[in-house]
């Protein structure tokens, strides 16, 4: 820590000190000393292609494609998403939490409850604002709210919070989950590896879903199915739904923003929301926290607690989940009328307590051990 403090890197020194690390390694490049929390190439000669391009009020570093290291990743503008990130970053800096070192110091000073309350208030303000916008558009014909987002982005929790806020705006929400409209297991499409492709839009019973959607919007009552993930079949348990005079239909699922899902409904009746986990807090000024790490940790805990999956199972399936997101979710995120950031300032500190013992069950001989070890090293900060 002294080495970094002498070079004016107080953010890095605070992080190392708050993590209780008396010693740490460091990297040197042409006289410049720094530390990176992950793998580095042995020399700059390994980096054959890269580019820097203007992006908003900064620059975007273009890196090689994983599958084709001689070609750069294409530049895909995500203007709405980046704007939400900037707003969250501004709020975070307003409360003096630029990085994990600042967060750890606040916790050590007994300010945990204040950090939690500020985080909750920031999110509730966002939810209330979106609900007010939906209520304002209700008079112009909006009757369907579509909520999408990648795995473990907090869609279901957001959906529940939004429904409460809609009620305060005198709107009656009628909730519908796309998870209940999966095809029976034997009818589910398979991927190139011959495995069931549950991430595909066509894993849903689209004709049946659209038929039920039309009935609801026409004022008819429907019986909502429930998908049994253990048997892989749709079952009916007598749950009925019917829209009232002041109702909006709130549909939640990873494919909700895909135009093909609700192609039979005109856009003027829809309000689209994209939920993501934009982890704006960074480890220090030179090391950011990937949003995918936050979501992966959420999913590991959720799968372990509610689905009986080990950390090894979740880590093994994660690449397939990510491929599905790249194909079926991310291309439609900029179609959203509103975006919601479900990341909490204190979240990673809270996840650590549950995630560490689960990740610790991955054995050294398991293929997933390298990823589990990386996550454990990251959580120690």
Label the model's feature ranges.
Residues 1-126, 130, 134-138:
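Auxiliary tRNA-acceptor-end handling modules of aminoacyl-tRNA synthetases
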Residues 138, 262-381:
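Conserved NTP phosphate-binding and transfer environment spanning the P-loop NTPase/kinase superfamily
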Residues 145-147:
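Hydrophobic anchor at the beta1->P-loop junction of P-loop NTPases
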Residues 150:
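P-loop (Walker A) phosphate-binding loop of NTP-binding proteins
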Residues 154:
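Conserved glycine(s) of the Walker
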Residues 157-162, 177:
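Hydrophobic positions on the alpha1 helix immediately C-terminal to the Walker A/P-loop
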Residues 164-174:
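Post-Walker A helix-loop "phosphate-sensing" segment adjacent to the P-loop in P-loop NTPases
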Residues 174-176, 183-232, 248:
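Conserved nucleotide-sensing/catalytic segment adjacent to the nucleotide-binding pocket
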